[in-house]
Amino acid sequence: MLATDSDPIVAIATAAGRGGIGVVRVSFGRGGEAAALPLIDALCGQKLAPRHASYVPFLDAHGAPLDRGIALYFPAPHSYTGEHVLELQGHGGPIVMQLLLQRCLDAGRGFGLRLAEPGEFTRRAFLNDKLDLAQAEAVADLIEASTEAAARSAGRSLDGAFSRQIHALVDDVITLRMLVEATLDFPEEEIDFLEAADARGKLAKIRAQLAHVLGDARQGALLREGLSVVLAGQPNVGKSSLLNALAGAELAIVTPIAGTTRDKVAQTIQVEGIPLHIIDTAGLRETEDEVERIGIARTWSEIERADVVLHLLDSRTGMTPDDETIAARFPAGVPVVRVLNKTDLTGVPACVEHPAAEGDLTEVHLSAKRGDGIDMLRAELLRIAGWQAGAEGVYLARERHLIALRAAQEHLAQAADHAEQRAQSLDLFAEELRLAQEQLNAITGEFTSDDLLGVIFSRFCIGK
């Protein structure tokens, strides 16, 4: 534990700016009640009943009121952080909040009260076993959720839905490890612990459950991160019109002049609760215009980072040699959908054509101008992302969770291989189970380095 993890800390817990209510939060750390009671007396001029709302003045150093509001005192361990906590709920003006924060710092100087770092209140909740690490991350995810579906999924993670799944897997792995260790420790016994307890069947069940959890986690990660979709193609094929059609608003300038878009225009839209980050880019062509060339270079940078590229073509000309040149430069690992726009000029009905042979691309025929085929394109993007329509009970997950789950999956696959070789590989079987458990424990924070904790909590807002 870092030395600063026990310092008394204070911060404004509400968002910056003006609001009806603002909150200053104090967690007293090692100071405990000996620090809390004098600070309460200095700021409120009276004792506070634990866990009761008291309407009191907030006093300056001379006893004059800075504000009036609600004071709440939560003695340890029954608080958000597990420490003694004081919350002062006043009027949400930035000046009065700063005055109240500074008053707390001045009154608490004697016992070492300092400003909290980003995420430090939630970090303490984790260190004091009020939340596990997956739940702590869900606090930040709930605050940052960009769609209703993401917010509801983050709420389920905060409630412990994801953690319960992980704990159940860990318990099953521990049970299996006990059987293996018993067989290793008592080789002379006539009882075959593994056969008697159907160890292979138990392992198969664990692997099936892990696959289910990983599938749900992928859905949750998609809700959290969304999908980065880059619109690419030659100038004047309708990229800006398609952005406007997908967003349902006039976000980009649309003209018949080639090269109108010289820098990216980005917009996030929701499709079934999934954030789609749509990026309209400069048209790809040879040009002597220095500003346009910079925009084109940025387009290729966006394509390199994309989750999906929509390669727009004019349906009147189809795939031209210039389009072939562009397509040849697309990164091999990025999915590409060929979008033939302007079907309103050709009379071709809007449709989706899936590849008939390996290596072919999905083609979507649409009219961005009329909106024909836009819903088909949205559905195709969700299909590429792997979204399961109507999925219930999904919890939000992060990339580190997916990495840990995949690693655990690989260790269990190795364990299954060793189980088949039984006599020669029992030690390796046990080791793979241990490594799988270690990966699962890292998700909830039961086995996590201080460096990782520092990264996770540094991304929280101050006061949370």
Swiss-Prot record:
It is an enzyme of class 3 (hydrolase). One of its GO terms (molecular function) is GTP binding. It comes from the Bacteria. GTP binds at residues 236-241, 255-261, 280-283. It is found in: Cytoplasm. CDD domains: trmE (cd04164), TrmE_N (cd14858). GO terms for biological process: tRNA methylation; tRNA wobble uridine modification. Mg(2+) binds at S240, T261. One of its GO terms (cellular component) is cytosol. InterPro entries: G_TrmE (IPR031168), GTP-bd (IPR006073), GTP-bd_TrmE_N (IPR018948), GTPase_MnmE (IPR004520), MnmE_dom2 (IPR027368), MnmE_helical (IPR025867), P-loop_NTPase (IPR027417), Small_GTP-bd (IPR005225). (6S)-5-formyl-5,6,7,8-tetrahydrofolate binds at R25, E87, K130, K464. Homodimer. Heterotetramer of two MnmE and two MnmG subunits. Exhibits a very high intrinsic GTPase hydrolysis rate. Involved in the addition of a carboxymethylaminomethyl (cmnm) group at the wobble position (U34) of certain tRNAs, forming tRNA-cmnm(5)s(2)U34. Belongs to the TRAFAC class TrmE-Era-EngA-EngB-Septin-like GTPase superfamily. TrmE GTPase family. This is tRNA modification GTPase MnmE.
